[in-house]
């Protein structure tokens, strides 16, 4: 699966490189890394050296930069390796919405959002269970 990784400067570049190589070992083809902010662990020049993975700058406009990267690189998914405080949950969901609107999955540690299915509806009845609470399938 071809992915664009979201990274930040709040992690040491060595750790980010390890995360990218682990992603590659898990079957992801990392096309590029999009830097979404943070510079705590970067050098004076704020350079983010991720080896063979090209780094795209998205600190000023992460949503626009992600949209452009998805369109240009034709990624299948966005792999979120960033963390707070660089990306708040609100900002993370905005980036997920950008990816999903362009037909890309949004993947992170312990979660995956897939874009809506745009195929024609099935010709047979279907059922869905949503909004279940803690008392589902229990007797009271």
Identify the function of each model-found stretch.
Residues 40-43, 114-120:
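Low-complexity, flexible helical/coil segments
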Residues 1-107:
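Long, basic/Gly/Ser/Thr-rich N-terminal segments
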Residues 96-117, 130-132:
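Short, acidic/small-residue loops that bind anionic groups at enzyme active sites
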Residues 61, 108-112, 138:
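Short amphipathic alpha-helical surface micro-motifs
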Residues 116-140:
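Walker A (P-loop) phosphate-binding motif
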